[in-house]
Swiss-Prot record:
Name listed for the protein in its UniProt record: 11.9 kDa wall protein
GO CC term (a single one): extracellular region
Keyword Ion transport carried by entry: no
Propeptide residues, chain positions: 1-12
Disulfide bond sites: none
Cell location: Secreted, Cell wall
Major subcellular location class: secreted
Keyword terms, alphabetized: Cell wall, Secreted
Keyword Signal: no
Organism: Tuber borchii
Tissue: Unripe and ripe fruit bodies but not in mycelium or ectomycorrhizal roots.
Function, as annotated: May play a role in the structure of the hypha-forming fruit bodies.
Length: 120
């Protein structure tokens, strides 16, 4: 008789809260012109969970991270391109936009394929 080893999933989904979205020593941020950038200074996002998806709100504006025509920008939450999947608090993962199925890419700063969310 053999027994199976049951393992927990490799990643933990995030809960509502405030997080840094980071890769190594770089943080996903928003500059004063509302452009999505990467910087070495910490930057906090407000994260909302909607089923299996997340919304990432910029706390300095009323807008959310969206994938609009392949360019990551800030837009109102009502934008269908504002939902993201794959967010994890323990293993760096690609953040995939639920509507466009594209991974997060940042036009200003050091590009990165994977991200981890660190609760503040």
């Amino acid at each position: 008789m053999s027994s199976k080893i049951v393992r927990e999933p490799a990643t933990k989904a995030v809960a509502d809260g405030t997080y840094h979205i980071k890769n190594g020593g770089y943080y996903l941020a928003v500059n004063p012109d509302r452009q999505i950038i990467i910087q070495q200074t910490v930057y906090a996002w407000t994260v909302f969970v909607d089923g299996e998806y997340n919304y990432f709100k910029d706390p300095k504006t009323t807008h959310y991270l969206t994938d609009n025509g392949g360019q990551n920008v800030l837009s109102p939450k009502a934008d269908v391109d504002g939902r993201w999947g794959n967010a994890s608090v323990d293993i760096p993962t690609q953040l995939i936009n639920a509507e466009t199925e594209r991974s997060l890419g940042v036009p200003y700063g050091t590009p990165s394929d994977t991200w981890i969310l660190v609760q503040v």
